[in-house]
Swiss-Prot record:
Gene3D superfamilies: QueA-like (3.40.1780.10). Transfers and isomerizes the ribose moiety from AdoMet to the 7-aminomethyl group of 7-deazaguanine (preQ1-tRNA) to give epoxyqueuosine (oQ-tRNA). Belongs to the QueA family. InterPro entries: QueA, QueA_dom1, QueA_dom2, QueA_sf. Its main location: cytoplasm. Monomer. Pathway: tRNA modification; tRNA-queuosine biosynthesis. It comes from Haemophilus ducreyi (strain 35000HP / ATCC 700724). The gene is queA. One of its GO terms (biological process) is queuosine biosynthetic process. This is S-adenosylmethionine:tRNA ribosyltransferase-isomerase. Keywords: Cytoplasm, Queuosine biosynthesis, S-adenosyl-L-methionine, Transferase. The keyword Cytoplasm applies. One of its GO terms (cellular component) is cytoplasm. Its EC number is 2.4.99.17.
Amino acid sequence: MLVSDFHFNLPDELIARYPKDERTASRLLHLNGESGKFSDLHFSDLLDHINPGDLLIFNNTRVIPARLYGRKESGGKLEVLIERVLDEHHCLAHIRCSKAPKAGTKLILGEDKLGIGNGLEATMISRHDTLFELRFNATTPLFTLLQQAGHIPLPPYIDRPDEDFDQERYQTVYSKVLGAVAAPTAGLHFDNPMLDKLKAKGVNMAFVTLHVGAGTFQPVRVENILEHNMHAEYAEVTQAVVDQILATKAAGKRVIAVGTTSVRSIESAAQATQPTGKLIAPFFSDTNIFLYPGKTFKIVDVLITNFHLPESTLIMLVSAFAGYRHTMNAYQHAVQQKYRFFSYGDAMLINKNPNALNDLP
């Protein structure tokens, strides 16, 4: 199975660089995974496709202002993208600069927001492969410092500086647990009135946490996808969520994942539980689960997701869920119908293809 199997041509003008004025104003492409038929809807039509007793599972991670601009104490300019906060003063980060800093190098960060001479001071402690461990020298907790000095880390394909409105619109309305450096974008389409309507209809809701890392934007660098090393992200699935999933399955209702990060959290928990013979159990760990055509989904029945990058691990996940040909046909239709792509773009509603194992590249 080759990376090129998941290529499609995407005109640049279909990349959504700004969100719609209203969260629910996006379009929705409904793909029936079993038949391969699709229909063009609006996101507000989702209410007609979710039934009482179904369980919607959201990812409640909250994006941190993880991008910092600054300089080495010696003067060289640099850009820091925090990948993971380790504790109140330490983090792992990507650093872009002309020459990688050595251990002990002092960095001055955030002067563009805090003013010249008022920047945050950090020290490079050690290097871990492509990541740098930094210690921030202030007594103030790191999350607080980032709120003061950091920028919302918009994905590279949005290709513009972050603006004030991104602080709200690049977060889901239910985001709660700080830690992500990218938004779980399928959730961006939900506003509070829509959530209230779903609750009034008798739809159940649960929340997992997966802190989306910058690795989600990294290209697959091998031609044979079986050789790809998936990046790790931290995920939590609590006992309460497990109980809701088991009750939903027992009642013959559907588990609907909002976003690929919710899928990866739930299916990681199910995969880790396999040796015990249980369907699913609580999960608190890093996951590097890689779902591609030929892999099965033990829990998720329906997926709500945005349109993903060509040749990405996320379009591979969708292809595993809906079937390869059905997915690529739907993407071709989306391009022809000028759907908006990626984080601020439109969405898909996909019913799982029970025959996806027979629909491979």
